[in-house]
Amino acid sequence: MNVGHVVQVIGVVVDIRFPPGQVPDIYNAIKITSDKEDAFGRKIDLTLEVAQHLGNNTVRTVAMSSTDGLVRGMKAVDTGAPITCPVGRPTLGRLVDVLGQPIDGKGPIISDKRYPIHRPAPPLVEQSTKAEQLETGIKVIDLLVPFLKGGKIGLFGGAGVGKTVIVMELINNIAKQHGGISVFAGVGERTREGNDLYREMTEAGVLDKTTMVFGQMNEPPGARLRVALTGLCLAEYFRDEEGADTLLFIDNIFRFTQAGSEVSALLGRMPSAVGYQPTLATEMGQMQERITSTVKGSVTSVQAVYVPADDLTDPAPATTFAHLDGTVVLSRQIAELGIYPAVDPLDSTSRILDPLVVGNEHYQTARGVQKVLQRYKELQDIIAILGMEELSDDDKLVVARARKLQRFLSQPFHVAEAFTGMSGKFVPIKETIRGFQEILDGKHDDLPEDAFYMVGSIEEAVEKGKKLLG
């Protein structure tokens, strides 16, 4: 057993000296346990991660929980391996922290397998080169922002526009339609939101297909920096060992960067642009490159991205953009119209909205919808000033169809049934394309626009329209 002792404590950074020739490797986990109590009366049981070798047999480590109660001279034991977390089926339906320890009060997780949180990305020969769409059953996403299986999607939105509801619906649909597994990593967000999500998912009945990992705002930066990797290693197990199509949700990827910035400053590194860490691109790349499809299975990630001061050129979101295959932009203006999911059909983009991947029919329909909605956007100023009467007959038709398309992009969600009173709908991609194409072709010009609001397939809209017309 390799035992050192604490020589310096600066906040969450702890320097530990080991005997000559026994200095632990970078990323090794160090344990400090003591019967001495901290300020809250808890016995000290602390895990730290080696971040730097300082020379003179001393290492600088970053703590994964509070360093309250630590004193110089305390014994520190090198575990000889990186931080590991339990993986596999026993973790489903459970809530864990950065170290894989349960925090849901349901007892220990009994798993015979543990994965290190630091793992290399899959080699190129094992990666799948096939571009394939992941069917989500959400019309606006499947049509305009198709998700790449094994890809990375950014979810951009302010407070209260429905990020969490979309996340929950995706978890629900993947679990029920594909038998898929989801991992939710809460990185540096509000504890209340994590609690709400846990309760809502329990009520919606999707928790047994999900593992949740939390490192919240009140945790030290070391935990917030590593919790995304804990979530990722849980997802990698299901991909590599069970061949599952796994969904990884990270909320919020900006907090991962923010925690990295705090740790970097504490380690004494020279800051780079806007005060961020000089290793920003490396840290982001090491994590994002592990999120990919292999010949065995896939890890598809949906990452909520907070944009500081709405500045997309800020180094944190700008570095994230480089890795994304698609961006789903949630708009407050659309939410105010009562159209949910409040996805902006003109701002959202996907790399695989390409006729070679999704097929020509899908591509032409999606572009047709965007063209009509763009024209409607251009005409809105004229309508506001002069009214509909001043438009040409062609433009009146465009406006009528655009308003129907806009409403048809809304959809009742399974996880929101308790609030909307409407049963949720899963719409297959073929049905989605056919419905929008029929509206573009003018087959439903006779129906009122309310018929298209909060329905699933086009047949439901026609039926609702007939009822409205009496």
UniProtKB/Swiss-Prot annotation:
GO molecular function: ATP binding; ATP hydrolysis activity; proton-transporting ATP synthase activity, rotational mechanism
Organism of origin: Pelotomaculum thermopropionicum (strain DSM 13744 / JCM 10971 / SI)
Alphabetic keyword roster: ATP synthesis, ATP-binding, Cell membrane, CF(1), Hydrogen ion transport, Ion transport, Membrane, Nucleotide-binding, Translocase, Transport
Membrane-related topology note: Peripheral membrane protein
Binding site for ATP: 157-164
Classification lineage: Bacteria, Bacillati, Bacillota, Clostridia, Eubacteriales
Subunit relationships: F-type ATPases have 2 components, CF(1) - the catalytic core - and CF(0) - the membrane proton channel. CF(1) has five subunits: alpha(3), beta(3), gamma(1), delta(1), epsilon(1). CF(0) has three main subunits: a(1), b(2) and c(9-12). The alpha and beta chains form an alternating ring which encloses part of the gamma chain. CF(1) is attached to CF(0) by a central stalk formed by the gamma and epsilon chains, while a peripheral stalk is formed by the delta and b chains.
Catalysed reactions listed for this entry: ATP + H2O + 4 H(+)(in) = ADP + phosphate + 5 H(+)(out)
Locations listed in the record: Cell membrane
Superkingdom of this protein's organism: Bacteria
Protein's recorded name: ATP synthase subunit beta
Gene: atpD
The enzyme's E.C. designation: 7.1.2.2
Family: Belongs to the ATPase alpha/beta chains family.
Described function: Produces ATP from ADP in the presence of a proton gradient across the membrane. The catalytic sites are hosted primarily by the beta subunits.
Major localization class: membrane
Cellular compartments per GO CC: plasma membrane; proton-transporting ATP synthase complex
